Amino acid sequence: MQKVKEMIGSINELDTKAQQQMEQHLNTLTKPLGSLGLLESLAIKIAGITGHTQPEIDPATVIVMVADHGVAAEGVSAYPSEVTQQMVHNFITGGAAINVLSRVSNASVQIVDIGVNGTLQLPGLINKNVRHGTNNMAQGPSMEREEAIAAIEVGIEVAQAAIQNGAKLLALGEMGIGNTTASSAMLAALEQVPVEQIVGFGTGLSHEGKEKKVAVIKRAIEVNQPNAADPIDVLAKVGGLEIAGLAGIVLGAAAWRIPVLVDGFITAVAALTAVRIAPLCVHYLIASHQSVEPGHVCVNKLLGLTPLVNLNLRLGEGSGTAIALPIVRSAIRIAHEMATFEQAGVSGAIEDVGKEK
């Protein structure tokens, strides 16, 4: 827990001076004030995150945390548990959606085994396995508290290693059959939200399957009685190893003043967990998209984040972050490369036109 405490103590507020300077700079560029909307807000936010008036977000790295879930035995997913391991092979060989989308958006991808139910020895795979999958949370705690903390610390270590290797932006990705169930349970427990309001169809459940998923989550919460005031207790009782690891990435990135691009529902719950551990983390988050999962709408609202796009995604893997990365990059390039009115020899606005006297 010492490493987690160190991160909490290292996370600061945004640099308001850098934000003000960025806003002033944007207001001198050859465009009407505020006319680039969310792009300008992004540039100002990233200036505040990094503390630089000319921030950089490249190289960008997508970190995909992978783990299995014991609750999958309850039949809460449309796919069998072995798909988790099979997808790791797909990630490593470059055939998954996140690989393709990251190539398009010029981001590197790291795959981390933090809790796969098996032993994988694959070139390029980062082996940080805390335990071989969680227990079935419908019957008892997903893991021990110490294991949840260990998984958070793995995330911190992975984030710091990526940053030390040059990453200027970290994007969150995940894979784990059953992890929408764990994420829904965590959100319901952390925020006292009715389970029915946040559970979606996951990877393609039927209406009957969705009802079963709701019942399993309710049973898990009843059996484990997670403490809403203690996010690590919630993680340990109804969470997942990859969710804990992703929360650690957020903590590590925030401590190093690095922006975090959040993907879909699972990564958003991980980010919410990090914010419940260290509230200042919220300033370092950028929501890449709004997925079709109803719980994702809820989490983005809780975090106060405005998603950059809505493409009806429900994949995970970090896919939304790779799609949104060029938008974030555009915000930075606007600040770096647009000419000012003075540089371009363009006349500014007529001060009194349209204003009440």
Swiss-Prot record:
Pathway: Nucleoside biosynthesis; alpha-ribazole biosynthesis; alpha-ribazole from 5,6-dimethylbenzimidazole: step 1/2
GO biological process: one example: cobalamin biosynthetic process
Protein name as it appears in the record: Nicotinate-nucleotide--dimethylbenzimidazole phosphoribosyltransferase
Keyword set, alphabetical order: Cobalamin biosynthesis, Glycosyltransferase, Transferase
InterPro entries the record matches: Nict_dMeBzImd_PRibTrfase (IPR003200), Nict_dMeBzImd_PRibTrfase_bact (IPR017846), Nict_dMeBzImd_PRibTrfase_N (IPR023195), Nict_dMeBzImd_PRibTrfase_sf (IPR036087)
Originating species: Halalkalibacterium halodurans (strain ATCC BAA-125 / DSM 18197 / FERM 7344 / JCM 9153 / C-125) (Bacillus halodurans)
Protein's job: Catalyzes the synthesis of alpha-ribazole-5'-phosphate from nicotinate mononucleotide (NAMN) and 5,6-dimethylbenzimidazole (DMB).
NCBIfam families, A to Z: cobT_DBIPRT, PRK00105.1
Family statement drawn from the similarity comment of this UniProt entry: Belongs to the CobT family.
